[in-house]
């Protein structure tokens, strides 16, 4: 797609892929011959080559990172991300097979690889651009289903259906791009140093509609509907949550004077019936789908901003010579469309924390499988280690867990940052007898306890407390949960849960506080 195209003849072909014809000319209506070549400006060639080379390299590396992020992280292997990978593959193919030759044509000013390769190169250009926008069209439909039917989405959009949709994208792209290779084009020019896509009017109209304008209309309609549904659903879910919260009589923190057994029974009954659970599930799933729709909306918006100027300027310049933009402006518009290929790898980590973490792991050469082996070893050794220090101010329950799920070489205690949770102060009688050193509870290999509960004995009336000071201050049991497949890091893998029931030096006080790894 060389912007130095002679558009003196009236044609409806918006030759929007590949370098356009008459690339090696010095005036608007001059064409070169086999014996005349433009003189190469070395300084300009080096500067333009470095800029375009850096751009192409960034596009290649960025799209490879997107593909590896989904391939190496099981929790990212969702139907939506399959469409993102397909988009990255189209951009990567464009960066490998089209952009280097477009840059060479821009630097040299003429085509050097012959007529046959010119036709193949132009067809691949059409193929990649069409696959990109059809992938965005499939993404917009997927996001509408995800927002409109958030609870039914896993059954409506399965992995098999997503793969079939991706195959359809490439089949349609091939049908649109293969026409010139089968003879649907105007006669080839005599000069092999001229290279461009066909300007045959019917093919130009067919390719323009099928590759850009019809998919663009579908994308805009889908995202308008996504916005309307998201706005209405958000209002309904928020109203439902507020209503359930006003009708609910459950309290997370209960202050009462009943004994520990009665309160435990009431807590168990409360867990069995939660009127807000269905609303919470709907709100969580919908918010997740809406966030994904926002990220992909940015991708679609940038695609339109990059390609729309080109698809407006080129047809108008081809049909009406007076509306043709200056060569410098047209070159900027032309490369702006190609620039879209390196934008998506920037958008994903900036809009998605999951992609950002995946990019960091890949760039840091961190093996995902090695992290899973470490977590399995941690679970075999007991999961989490707790330390109770009764004579600190207010007392504290300290939890030691590595943020990267790592164990020290000795296999005794888990390494990592210390997390503290306020607990109860010990009784004066306990301190008066001379308190023992802090109890260090470490994850030894022989621990095989199936449950977890850290609790203090039920508070006694003030008159009888002194008789029971010789009893244990608390009891401890350990729990490890199986790793949920497809989760990342330590936020929900394995993990530990504990309920701390503390006396706090006051009779009748109780606090239930669940602990989850990474949530303090």
UniProtKB/Swiss-Prot annotation:
Disulfide bond annotation, renumbered to this chain: 118-195
Motif (Nuclear localization signal): 368-380
Glycan-modified residues: 10, 24, 29, 34
Covalently attached lipid (S-palmitoyl cysteine), positions: 365
Name of the protein described by the UniProt record: Alpha-1B adrenergic receptor
Keywords: Cell membrane, Cytoplasm, Disulfide bond, G-protein coupled receptor, Glycoprotein, Lipoprotein, Membrane, Nucleus, Palmitate, Phosphoprotein, Receptor, Transducer, Transmembrane, Transmembrane helix
Side Cytoplasmic, residues: 71-83, 142-161, 225-295, 352-520
Organism from which the protein derives: Homo sapiens
GO terms under cellular component: caveola; cytoplasm; nuclear membrane; nucleus; plasma membrane
Membrane topology, record value: Multi-pass membrane protein
GO biological process assignments: adenylate cyclase-activating adrenergic receptor signaling pathway; adenylate cyclase-modulating G protein-coupled receptor signaling pathway; cell-cell signaling; G protein-coupled receptor signaling pathway; intracellular signal transduction; neuron-glial cell signaling; phospholipase C-activating G protein-coupled receptor signaling pathway; positive regulation of cytosolic calcium ion concentration
Location relative to the cell: Nucleus membrane; Cell membrane; Cytoplasm; Membrane, Caveola
One Pfam family in the UniProt entry: 7tm_1
One MF annotation (Gene Ontology) recorded for this entry: alpha1-adrenergic receptor activity
Residue ranges, annotated region (Disordered): 394-432, 479-520
Sequence ranges on the Extracellular membrane side: 1-45, 106-115, 185-201, 320-326
Segments traversing the membrane: 46-70, 84-105, 116-141, 162-184, 202-224, 296-319, 327-351
């Amino acid at each position: 797609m060389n912007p130095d195209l002679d558009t003196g003849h009236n044609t409806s072909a918006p030759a929007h892929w590949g370098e356009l014809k008459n690339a090696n000319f010095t005036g608007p209506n001059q064409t070169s011959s086999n014996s005349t070549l433009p003189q190469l400006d070395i300084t300009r060639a080096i500067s333009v080559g470095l800029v375009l080379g850096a751009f192409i390299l960034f596009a290649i590396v960025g799209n490879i990172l997107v593909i590896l992020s989904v391939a190496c992280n099981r929790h990212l292997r969702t139907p939506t991300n399959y469409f993102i990978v397909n988009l990255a593959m189209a951009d990567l193919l464009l960066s490998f097979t089209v952009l280097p030759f477009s840059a060479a044509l821009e630097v040299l000013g003429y085509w050097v690889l012959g007529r046959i390769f010119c036709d193949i190169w132009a067809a691949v250009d059409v193929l990649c651009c069409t696959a990109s926008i059809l992938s965005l069209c499939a993404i917009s439909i997927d996001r509408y289903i995800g927002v409109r039917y958030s609870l039914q989405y896993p059954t409506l959009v399965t992995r098999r259906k997503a793969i079939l949709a991706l195959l359809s994208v490439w089949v349609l792209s091939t049908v649109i791009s293969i026409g010139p290779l089968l003879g649907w084009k105007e006669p080839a020019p005599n000069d092999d140093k001229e290279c461009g896509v066909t300007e045959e009017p019917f093919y130009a109209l067919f390719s323009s509609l099928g590759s850009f304008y019809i998919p663009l209309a579908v994308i805009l309609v889908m995202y308008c509907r996504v916005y309307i549904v998201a706005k209405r659903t958000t209002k309904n879910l928020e109203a439902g949550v507020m209503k359930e919260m006003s009708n609910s009589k459950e309290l997370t923190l209960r202050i009462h004077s009943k004994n520990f057994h009665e309160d435990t029974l009431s807590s168990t009954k409360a867990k069995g019936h939660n009127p807000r659970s269905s609303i919470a599930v709907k709100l969580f799933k919908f918010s997740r789908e809406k966030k994904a729709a926002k990220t992909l909306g940015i991708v679609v918006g940038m695609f339109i901003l990059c390609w729309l100027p080109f698809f407006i300027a080129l047809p108008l310049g081809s049909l009406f010579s007076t509306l043709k933009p200056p060569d410098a402006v047209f070159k900027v518009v032309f490369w702006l469309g190609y620039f879209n290929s390196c934008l998506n790898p920037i958008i994903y980590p900036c809009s998605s924390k999951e992609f950002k973490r995946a990019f960091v792991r890949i760039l840091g050469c961190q093996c995902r499988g090695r992290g899973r082996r470490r977590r399995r070893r941690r679970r075999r050794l007991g999961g989490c280690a707790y330390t109770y220090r009764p004579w600190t101010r207010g007392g504290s329950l300290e939890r030691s867990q590595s943020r990267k799920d790592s164990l020290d070489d000795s296999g005794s205690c888990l390494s990592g940052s210390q997390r503290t949770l306020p607990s109860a102060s010990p009784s004066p009688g306990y301190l008066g007898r001379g308190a023992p050193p802090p109890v260090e509870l470490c994850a030894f290999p022989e621990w095989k306890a199936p449950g977890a509960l850290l609790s203090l004995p039920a508070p006694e009336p003030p008159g009888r407390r002194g008789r029971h000071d010789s009893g244990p201050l608390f009891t401890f049991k350990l729990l490890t949960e199986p790793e949920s497949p497809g989760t990342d890091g330590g936020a929900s893998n394995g993990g530990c849960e504990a309920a701390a029931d503390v006396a706090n030096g006051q009779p009748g006080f109780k606090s239930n506080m669940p602990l989850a790894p990474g949530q303090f």
